[in-house]
């Protein structure tokens, strides 16, 4: 058997084959047969036979790759696609006529808007995600290496209507007519994905359901802003997603180096994710109630909290903010959270504390100097706040202000505490008596030195 074919191979490969042949001389014949087979296959490819689809599939190949009922694995009609294009399209899983491999495509009638081949290699990540404040909808999110003709690179995001999807499954005979649990649809779609070579996670599955991979443990989502765009930040077991207004951001959790908190107020704060390559992404207007979940996620993923780093302390000092520089100082965000909790315990934010609400209304009447009170106590408190921002417009009623003020305190549940508050307010103001001319001679009950000053 000739060794001439070795001269046609790369030098490194030729040496490796030579090493094997010296140990096992009979293997030379096998190598030569393999070489000839490869030549024949290459010749067949050039002649157009046995051509296999590549990731960057050409339009000519798609023309021969027809979709029919016989090669369709699964189909959902009228899906709302949000990315990479915004259209109502049909989602189809089918087997290619070219080589029998599974394909995902989005169709408008018979026209392909997007097709993804070689799903086992091309789909990088896929997940079901909840739609905030819309329990009847669910997102299907997918990222991929490339699609046919490389027309798009943005992730695929589509919205599934749970009721419509259930009805389609029943019409296709995939579910019994009495089934109402949408998780049955999710389970079926996930199984089809596994059969076609990739996995769709379901990290927000109901905790009452059996889920052996426990994906739901670290998963939550919250509303925030990135710049001027409002969106949803999803914290998943292995990824963090911000969407779904372009550009959609996808982070591998292992690529996040650290997190910092800033712009902290009593109600909101900002969080910045810093990747290992130094890129920083800031998300603002996050509700204070979300801090505990973010902090737990950060600790589980062993990310660094650099909110109290020396660099940020130096920036705080330059702005005149005091800090003692101790290593074990609790973060300002934790202190803000505790302060908010203490205020809630004290009843500061209690809408049910009618006594405090009434005290506030009485004090508001004094502060604006109007002394006027409507029959509706709840509306009176709101009017008092508005009067603080405007000049008094009804000076012709000055003569009745003192009498109305006295009556206002007697009308609020008759509580001694509020009367005491009025006296405490009035007495120091009696140090300076300002005479007020009253047009009505019948108001003999008005007190001198009422403490109300008019412009």
Swiss-Prot record:
List, in alphabetical order, the Gene Ontology terms for molecular function in this entry: DNA binding; histone binding; nucleosome binding
Where N-acetylserine occurs, residue numbers?
2
Compositional bias (Acidic residues) spans?
Answer: 350-366, 376-395, 430-455
Stretch list, region Dimeric region: 2-67
- Biased-composition ranges, Polar residues, are 319-339, 402-418
Disulphide-bonded residues: none
Q: Which UniProt keywords apply?
A: Acetylation, Chaperone, Chromosome, DNA-binding, Nucleus, Phosphoprotein, Repeat, Transcription, Transcription regulation, Transposition
Region feature (Disordered): 305-455
Positions of the UniProt region annotated as Double PH domain: 68-301
- Composition bias type Basic and acidic residues, residue spans: 305-314, 420-429
Q: Which residues form a coiled coil?
A: none
List each copy of the PH domain by range.
68-200, 217-301
Cross-referenced SMART domains: Rtt106
In its keyword annotation, does this UniProt entry include Chaperone?
A: yes
UniProt xrefs under Gene3D superfamilies:
2.30.29.120, Pleckstrin-homology domain (PH domain)/Phosphotyrosine-binding domain (PTB) (2.30.29.30), RTT106-like (6.10.10.70)
Q: Which GO terms describe its cellular component?
A: chromosome; nucleus
Per the record, residues carrying Phosphoserine are 408, 411, 450
Q: Where in the cell is it found?
A: Nucleus; Chromosome
Where is the major localization of this protein?
Answer: nucleus
Gene Ontology terms: biological process: transposition
Q: Which family does it belong to?
A: Belongs to the RTT106 family.
Q: What is known of its domains?
A: The N-ter domain (residues 1-67) homodimerizes and interacts with H3-H4 independently of acetylation while the double pleckstrin-homology (PH) domain (residues 68-301) binds the 'Lys-56'-containing region of H3.
Functionally, this protein is described as follows:
Histones H3 and H4 chaperone involved in the nucleosome formation and heterochromatin silencing. Required for the deposition of H3K56ac-carrying H3-H4 complex onto newly-replicated DNA. Plays a role in the transcriptional regulation of the cell-cycle dependent histone genes by directly recruiting the SWI/SNF and RSC chromatin remodeling complexes to the histone genes in a cell cycle dependent manner. In cooperation with HIR and ASF1, creates a repressive structure at the core histone gene promoter and contributes to their repression outside of S phase.
Relate the assembly described in the record.
Interacts with the SWI/SNF, RSC and HIR complexes. Interacts with RLF2, SIR4, YTA7 and histones H3 and H4.
Name of this chain's protein: Histone chaperone RTT106
Q: Which organism is it from?
A: Saccharomyces cerevisiae (strain YJM789)
- What is the gene name? RTT106
């Amino acid at each position: 058997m000739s060794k001439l074919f070795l001269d046609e191979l790369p030098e490194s490969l030729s040496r490796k084959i030579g090493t094997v042949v010296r140990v096992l001389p009979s293997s030379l014949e096998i190598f030569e047969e393999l070489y000839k087979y490869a030549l024949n296959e290459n010749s067949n490819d050039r002649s157009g036979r046995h051509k296999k689809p590549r990731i960057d599939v050409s339009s000519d190949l798609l023309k021969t790759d027809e979709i029919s009922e016989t090669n369709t694995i699964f189909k959902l009609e009228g899906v709302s696609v949000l990315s990479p294009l915004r259209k109502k399209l049909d989602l189809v899983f089918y087997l290619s006529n070219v080589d029998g491999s599974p394909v995902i495509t989005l169709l408008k009638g018979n026209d392909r808007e997007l097709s993804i081949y070689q799903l086992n290699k091309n789909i990088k990540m896929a997940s079901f995600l909840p739609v905030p404040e819309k329990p009847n909808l669910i997102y299907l999110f997918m990222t991929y290496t490339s699609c046919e003709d490389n027309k798009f690179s943005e992730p695929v995001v589509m919205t599934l209507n749970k009721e419509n999807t259930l009805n389609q499954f029943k019409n296709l005979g995939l579910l019994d007519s009495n089934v109402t649990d949408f998780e049955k649809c999710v389970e079926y779609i996930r199984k089809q994905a596994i059969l076609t070579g990739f996995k769709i996670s379901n990290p927000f599955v109901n905790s009452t359901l059996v889920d052996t991979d426990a994906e739901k443990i670290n998963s939550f989502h919250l509303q925030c802003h990135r710049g001027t765009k409002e969106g949803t930040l999803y914290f998943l077991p292995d990824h963090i997603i911000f969407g779904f207004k372009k550009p959609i951001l996808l982070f591998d959790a292992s690529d996040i180096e650290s997190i910092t908190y800033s712009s902290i107020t009593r109600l909101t704060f900002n969080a910045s994710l810093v990747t290992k390559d130094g890129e920083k992404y800031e998300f603002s207007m996050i509700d204070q109630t979300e801090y505990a979940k973010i902090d737990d996620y950060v600790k589980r993923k062993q990310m660094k909290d650099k909110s109290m780093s020396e660099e940020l302390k130096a920036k705080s000092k330059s702005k005149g903010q005091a800090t003692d520089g101790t290593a074990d100082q609790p973060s300002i965000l934790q202190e803000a959270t505790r302060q908010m909790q203490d205020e809630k315990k004290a009843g500061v934010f209690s809408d049910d504390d009618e006594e405090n609400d009434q005290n506030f209304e009485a004090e508001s009447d004094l502060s604006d100097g109007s002394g006027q009170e409507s029959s509706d106590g709840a509306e009176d408190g709101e009017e008092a706040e508005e009067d603080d921002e405007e000049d008094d417009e009804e000076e012709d009623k000055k003569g009745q202000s003192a009498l109305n003020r006295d009556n206002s305190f007697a009308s609020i549940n008759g509580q001694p505490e509020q009367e005491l508050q009025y006296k405490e307010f009035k007495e120091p103001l009696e140090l300076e008596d300002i005479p007020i001319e009253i047009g009505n001679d019948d108001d003999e009950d008005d007190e001198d030195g009422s403490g109300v000053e008019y412009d």
